[in-house]
Amino acid sequence: YRQTMKTICYIIPYFGKLPKNFQIYLLSCAQNPTVNWKILTDDRTPYEFPTNVHVQYCNYEEVKQRIKAWFDFETVIDRPWRLSLFKPAYGEIFAEELSGYDFWGHCDIDLMWGNIRTFYSENNLNKYERLGFLGHSTLYKNTPEVNARYKRIVPGEINYKDVFSGRSNYSF
């Protein structure tokens, strides 16, 4: 009896020119064939995408409108970098793209991946609902409860509505 490996997908909206070292980043993704990446971008540079990296060509305005439509209050997404403030909500916003995965995550695209499964082992994936917290690589268990946790209000603390509707740069 062999337990099925938990599925992982990182979602990365990125608009504008991808970094110079992006092809190297893709090579490091290719070294992790049991992990998928979904990149939403308007950069049509003909990179050699490995089979586990899926590109959805779209523009910043489309993703911005998708995010704005998700919330019942005014959000501020006046520059592409502000998309990063919404990372904890990607599990809900991009639920269609993440459907069927056990875990979803967000990550930076200037990482050079080693063997992801060494740290994100089956033992850790079975034990935790969130792994990582600094944003360069964070995974969340793909369940409605976990995907909605960013909405928890902690009295006296800045909450998601403050972050998503404010003009300051936050992290939470």
Which residues make up each language-model segment?
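Active-site-proximal specificity loops/subdomain of glycosyltransferases
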Residues: P46-E97
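Catalytic core and acceptor-binding pocket of nucleotide-sugar-dependent glycosyltransferases
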Residues: A148-F172
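Short beta-strand-to-loop element that shapes/binds the nucleotide-sugar donor at the catalytic cleft/hinge
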Residues: Y128-E145
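Short, acidic, metal-binding catalytic loop of nucleotide-sugar glycosyltransferases
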Residues: I24-N36
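Short, polar loop motifs at secondary-structure junctions
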Residues: L40-P46
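A structural signal for isolated positions on well-ordered beta-strands in alpha/beta enzyme cores
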Residues: C9-I11, N36-K38, H54
